[in-house]
């Protein structure tokens, strides 16, 4: 797994957990990574670059949540955000943050990564759902945005 994929997955877990327990996303991210080093099982290490990328994504989503959610709501025809699965919504939030605020990451990379994360963490139809909405949003994003 690439460092950025690991970061995206950590960020998704933090945002999802934040939605469930209504806790600060950075605190949640820290707890998730700490849980990798606790317990009696062999520890999993979290790459420091992956953690830094996850933290950047989480902070970016939280700081720009209103603009991100507005884009998602605008393009999610027939789906209110309240009806969306929390996993799918947070995958969309992460990807929309990248599309809008990280011009250094190519659009196709952002979309492919979101689809792969949706396949891993979402329901059977999550990948196609995420792809459909992201395709609509990506088509409206200019390179300078």
UniProtKB/Swiss-Prot annotation:
The answer to whether keyword RNA-binding applies is yes
What cellular component terms from Gene Ontology apply here? cytosol
- Record-linked CDD domains: Terminator_NusB
Keyword terms of this UniProt record: RNA-binding, Transcription, Transcription antitermination, Transcription regulation
What does the entry give for GO biological process?
DNA-templated transcription termination; transcription antitermination
Per the record, the domain of life is: Bacteria
Tell me the GO molecular function terms. RNA binding
Q: What Pfam families does the record point to?
A: NusB
Which InterPro entries does this one have?
Answer: NusB-like_sf, NusB_fam, NusB_RsmB_TIM44
The record's family statement is: Belongs to the NusB family.
Relate the protein's function as given in its record. Involved in transcription antitermination. Required for transcription of ribosomal RNA (rRNA) genes. Binds specifically to the boxA antiterminator sequence of the ribosomal RNA (rrn) operons.
Q: What is this protein called?
A: Transcription antitermination protein NusB
């Amino acid at each position: 797994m690439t460092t950025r994929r690991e970061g995206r997955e950590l960020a998704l877990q933090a945002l999802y957990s934040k939605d469930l327990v209504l806790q600060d996303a950075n605190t949640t991210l820290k707890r998730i990574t700490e849980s990798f080093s606790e317990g009696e099982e062999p520890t999993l290490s979290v790459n420091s670059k992956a953690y830094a990328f996850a933290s950047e994504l989480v902070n970016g989503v939280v700081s720009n949540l209103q603009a991100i959610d507005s884009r998602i709501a605008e393009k999610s025809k027939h789906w209110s955000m309240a009806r969306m699965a929390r996993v799918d919504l947070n995958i969309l939030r992460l990807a929309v943050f990248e599309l809008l605020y990280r011009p250094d990451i190519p659009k196709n990379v952002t979309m492919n990564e979101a689809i792969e994360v949706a396949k891993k963490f979402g329901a059977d139809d999550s990948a196609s759902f995420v792809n459909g909405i992201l395709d609509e949003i990506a088509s409206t994003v200019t390179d300078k945005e």
